């Protein structure tokens, strides 16, 4: 499922740190060397490299990268080098600064990360920003958006495969009633989406589809053309049930004839490379009839392109 290619014989972190230090030395920066190392190391290996680099050269590797790199390439390398909880904490913070109808970052984090990983994200957020995600969400949202987002970032979902089919039937009926009434911010509607396990919610939505003839997101789409809350609600359901479809959509919207959304493109590649990028690539190919790496290569260039394509699993590890 992950697209990351790590060499069979990984160099020692001391050797990687030394090579990175050399990449920063002399006239100019050796971007190719940076990519050849960092784009082919997993999270644990990158963390070790950072620790060794700091101990050896008395400088945070991230600060060194920040001094040497620039633009979209810098953002991609920096996001990738961060530990996943640190990265999600940073992305969540940036998200609270710019809530827009297409800003799904908090939904992605809350709905696609495992429960224990989400706790680590919240701990990293508090350590870095001296406040909780919940505080910032409450401060920067209001109304229905706040009503949906707060329980999403606060929940601790059960992650087992156990499913109660009687509950699935009864809650599918509740969801259908609320959709029929257009009560999309109803307490029970939000409670079901924000607290049930993914397995339980999947059973509920399957029953909804079978019993009422439509997938719930198809019903919701009829109301969501100009409604930010409805778009967010649909993103929640997609992230909880078919995350690869959500991330394919973000990539598709990021790579288009109207210009590239480097923020969305970089975010998806750096956060999903070690998780489910192969599945996202398959979905992108199915939906757009072009391989994702080729689409990215057509829309980007230089070291930025090379970094993203390497994370997709292309090139030598």
Swiss-Prot record:
Q: Where is the PTM Phosphothreonine found along the chain?
A: 100, 112
Coiled-coil spans are none
Q: Where in the sequence is the signal peptide annotated?
A: none
Q: Where is this chain's protein located in or outside the cell? A: Cytoplasm, Cytosol; Membrane
Q: Which amino acids does the record list as binding Ca(2+) 2? A: 255, 259, 299
UniProt keywords (A-Z) are: Acetylation, Annexin, Calcium, Calcium/phospholipid-binding, Cytoplasm, Membrane, Metal-binding, Phosphoprotein, Repeat
Explain what induces or represses this protein's expression. Up-regulated by heat shock stress. Down-regulated by cold, dehydration, and salt stresses.
**Main location, first listed in the record:** cytoplasm
Sites bearing Phosphotyrosine, chain numbering? 129, 284
Q: Which InterPro entries match?
A: Annexin, Annexin_repeat, Annexin_repeat_CS, Annexin_sf, AnnexinD_plant
UniProt-listed SMART domains: ANX
Q: Does the keyword Metal-binding apply?
A: yes
Binding residues annotated for Ca(2+) 3, in chain numbering: 300, 305
Regarding protein family, the annotation reads: Belongs to the annexin (TC 1.A.31.1) family.
Q: What is this protein called?
A: Annexin D2
User: What is the species of this protein?
Assistant: Arabidopsis thaliana (Mouse-ear cress)
| UniProt gene name | ANN2
